[in-house]
Amino acid sequence: MQIRYLLALSLLPKLVLADESPATSASQCLIEPPVPRIVSQPGLSAADQAKIRIASDRSKAEMGKQAIFTGDVVFSQGDRHIAADEAILDQATEQFDANGNLVFQDSNFTVTADSLQAQMRSNRATLTGAQYWLHGQQVHGDAEKLQITINNNLILTNTNFTTCPPDNVSWLLEAEKIKINSEEEWGEIWNAKLRVADIPVFYIPYMTVPVSDKRKTGFLYPSFSTSTTNGFEVSAPYYWNIAPEYDLTFTPNYMTNRGLFTKTEFRYLAGEAQNGRLNLEYLGSDQMLNGSPNRYLYNWQHQGAIDKNWRVLANFTEVSDNNYFNDLKSDVNRATDNQLSRIGEVSYFERDWDISTRVQDIKVLGEDEKPYQVMPQVNFNYRAADFWNNLDFGFNSELTNFAHQDDDVNTATRLHMAPSLTLPIHGPSGSFTSQLKLMQTNYWQEKNNSKFDSLDDTVSRTIPQVRINGQINFERFTELFEHNYRQTLEPQFQYLYVGYEDQRGIGIYDTAQLQDDYFGLFRDRRFSGLDRIADANQVTLGITTRLFDDHNQEATKFSLGQIFYLQDSKLGYEDNIFEQNQSTSVLAAELDTRLSSNWYLGAAIQYDTNTSDNKKTEVTLDFRPEANKLLQFSYRYVPDLLNSNTNDLVNISQAGVRGAWPINDSLYFVGNWYYDLNETRSIETYTGVQYESCCYAIRLSYHYRIKTNYDDNIGSTIIDEREQFESGVYLNLIIKGLGGSGPLGVSDMLNDGLFNYRKPLYLRN
């Protein structure tokens, strides 16, 4: 005889929610049932697992009628057990009743109840006066009645549950009815009331919750916030599980100062190796702006592979106005982003060659001058290692058509080809690489305005390049500050010759000057893009030294380098791109060091030895005694930086401090403060306090930040009428077991602001 209801009862672990993450089910938070666990006999065969064993002090049975068991009754089948004072089995109707100190256990949960009534023929069972505990988790609760239906679903009546310890129930969810669908692994809750500190704080007439990682249509948990710009905000996301490969999340977000802001995110899988996302955001009649304009965003992202050789990529974003990201919390970009990238690319790869075609359009928010559009660009690259007598052969080419939204701006088609021969020599003591390259570029330009008459209709530019790069590795053992180290000394040099061609007849389509940091000193270009290839006859000298401790961990890295120009660049005189021709570049230095077991220093400087001017400085000092403790001081200085909002040159001189520190085992503090030394004002302040217990986590945070405002291209609001600063208070609450898997985490608090936390060290550990 098989007691099938025992199998049905094993569904009870899916009673309320999916398993908590390991971090939230630590041993100190586990809640064990008050009854002893019955340990199953290990090593049973499948046949033995299916057998039913009944033990009791007394029994009375008659064939085909009732069997009565009394006194310490124990029914066992595999790892499932029922203990009771009394049990009656009606063999004719297959009705099984048990009562008196009733306990049901399996490997997943324990249930105590006043009585059990089970109909084995229909696979139904009812437990009254039930209390349940999930093994290895924190979930436990009561139910006046617990029913197992014919479809192995669960129905709990007048029930409650919590993840808090019994002696300190911080929160409790009471419900008139909970229904668990075992097939869809989803729960429905009716007339739920959330109690916090035994005070009812929230009533939910109906809600759905997942009881596994399986996706299911339903409302997600709401969120609340407030700020000086948007007022009080409340959002209530709705998730729609359309199909295994499609889903959609719709989030209505109401802001008291602006109105109803809706977000829609559609995600999809296309085959086994492609995926994408579509975002639509809309705010109708923004009440904060003059004229109450409509504001919107749409974004499409797609990426993936087709077979083993093809790759596809797409990213397109459009917004209604320049200040969209600055005013509204978008799911696509951050408030500091002012560029919208629109890219479509298809690539094909083989071992020795690849080909790709790409279209690109970049929209810069707040700028009247629009960048050129790449419509399209085709790239072909070929490489052959050890092509002939240890020589590597390479061939890079591109064909690009530059278009523009304005009809009176010149456009062009550019063809570039660059074959190269490289002789690489590598060894443990160093490397020596020689390269010859010939760069051939052709332009066909359309002059759509008389101000571009100086440009040539067609251009053929041929520029040779010679590049020789070498590095030597020295090593020794030394003692510094009473510590033993292995020190390396890595001098590096590069000779670069690039021929000269008059390029005044070529327009500027995708070219900008590159930064002269230490690694930039060893580039073969001064500019990105191909519209300007600066002639060069120069030598770069650099040196890097590293210290490794007894555990072969890199403790310090210091690099210093500079370019020495053997000949002035003629390109600077023609295009006024360089301020003046100098005999040397900036002196670039970078330092990363572990000062002690807890203190770390990172610094970089670019110093103009010709004018004795500091061109750029960045310094960070970190104190990290433990993984969850951080204190960081930072400073950065950048002179003559172009403000894209006003087209003025500004000096950036900013200092900041950032900290993350546990006050005790449950309370955590995170904060940052950044100050503009030139403007003598704070540009961002963020303070957050987070408390976490075994059953809930709460975070209270405050932020104050400067806003990067642009002239609105919608409505009639001018930049002077917009708020320069924004402040707000945020309250986040996670009730563990009620849609949150906790903890809230610290990394997102560190990155919740204008300035993300950046670990400054790049030591090779």
From Swiss-Prot:
Pfam families the UniProt entry points to:
LptD, LptD_N
- Entry annotated with the keyword Signal: yes
Principal localization reads: membrane
Location in the cell reads: Cell outer membrane
PANTHER family xrefs = LPS-ASSEMBLY PROTEIN, LPS-ASSEMBLY PROTEIN LPTD
Which cellular components does GO assign to this protein? cell outer membrane; transporter complex
Tell me what this protein is called: LPS-assembly protein LptD
Q: Which UniProt keywords apply?
A: Cell outer membrane, Membrane, Signal
**Any signal peptide, and if so, which residues?**
1-18
